[in-house]
Amino acid sequence: MDPQSAIYTLPRVPTAAPTTGGVSWSHVGEVAILSFVALICIYLLYLWVLRDLILVLKARRGRSTEELIFGSEAVDRRHPIPNTLVPTAPVHPGPFVPGQG
């Protein structure tokens, strides 16, 4: 081979190895990563939007947000939960009562 033609010939580069049948691992990795990201997005959407939307829709159906029932904690409306904020003993206003003294 003369030096003049050696300049214009391309070097031999090995071709890529033939692929075997089946799914490549890079494709499996992409699907796994995208599934994980989608799961995180759905969870954050639930935390930030859907949970509040469910509360609003239940409140619009006639229940206040304090009366929402989760699971088997149903309360009989004929016998509601007593109000615990009502004092059981008489309340004394203290030493500084207006109009006395």
Curated annotation (Swiss-Prot):
It is a single-pass membrane protein. InterPro entries: Gemini_mov (IPR002621). GO terms for cellular component: host cell membrane; membrane. The chain crosses the membrane at residues 30-50. Pfam families: Gemini_mov. Involved in the viral transport within, and between cells. This is Movement protein. It comes from Maize streak virus genotype D (isolate Raw). The lineage of its organism: Viruses, Monodnaviria, Shotokuvirae, Cressdnaviricota, Repensiviricetes.
